[in-house]
Amino acid sequence: SFPASPRAPTAIVAMVATLGFPAILTLSRVSTRPEALRGVENPSPYGYTVSLSLFLLPVIVLSVFHMIRPRHHTHRRALLAASGVIAVLGFVLDTFFGHSFFTFRNEAATLGIRLPAWDWSALRWVPAYLPLEEFAFYILGALFVITTYLWFSEYWLQDYEPQEYQANTQTVGRLVQVSWPSLALWTALLALGLVFKRIGPDPDGFAGYFIFLMVLGFLPTFLFLRAVAAFVNWRAFAGSYAALMLVSLVWEATLGVPYNWWNYKRDQMLGIEVQAWSGLPLEAVLLWLVIAWDCVIAFEIFRVFFHMDRKPMQALFGHGAAAKE
């Protein structure tokens, strides 16, 4: 008989079920078509809350698998550390900029538990503005991307054996190595976005969300990209990004924005919208890439760091870079 393989049809069936069941459950919460929403009081009861199962169920399935059978003990530590960093970044986004960038008009789609948000225009806290579900998303979204990346990397598109990976980390002089080509590209894209905001169809306001994504979403990773790029399984990254896009097309483009679980303050956007997705702004689509990129890069930074077995300052900057005996 043929040896067991993760590519067996049972693995594919399990994957489809893990994504399909929460998708069916989420879609079942909707009782009205988007074009018929006018005058409908509650078209998607608890829809936002239930939709988080799109991330929760895959996270549970893949996390249990990874925790039971990690290829190396550093994977578990790196997964938790990277997920924590990305979740904190999401908390900062919502807590300090959620009032500036987002609206949450459909309270019936949530549990009704809301947290305060900072209003920069009035320099005060706005009580009961952010749905609790927002914070759950940032935790689950980070875990979803990293566990999916690990699944692709270890069981479908493997690049390294654990021993080879660990040996290669010892050749890294320091983690902080600025990627100047990436920084130059980042600068050009940032400038292009700001120019477009001023000469585009919606010049009023300020491209705050775009700037946030570019500065806090991409820029920090360029400090480490040269050091960890060789350790990233780029095929697995593509797989995890594709999985996130698939879920996001259902979660945000089909449901979240059309049913006003959340929406965007247009004066804080560039003005580029996808009309087929209820005017979804470009920044929302860019966030899908930011989440996937940050999660994978952060995971590999922590994984390389834990394998290096050096003191933090030595690992980051190469001072006394020899590994501990």
Language-model segments: what does each one mean?
Residues 1-325:
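Aromatic-rich, lipid-facing transmembrane alpha helices and their immediate juxtamembrane interface loops
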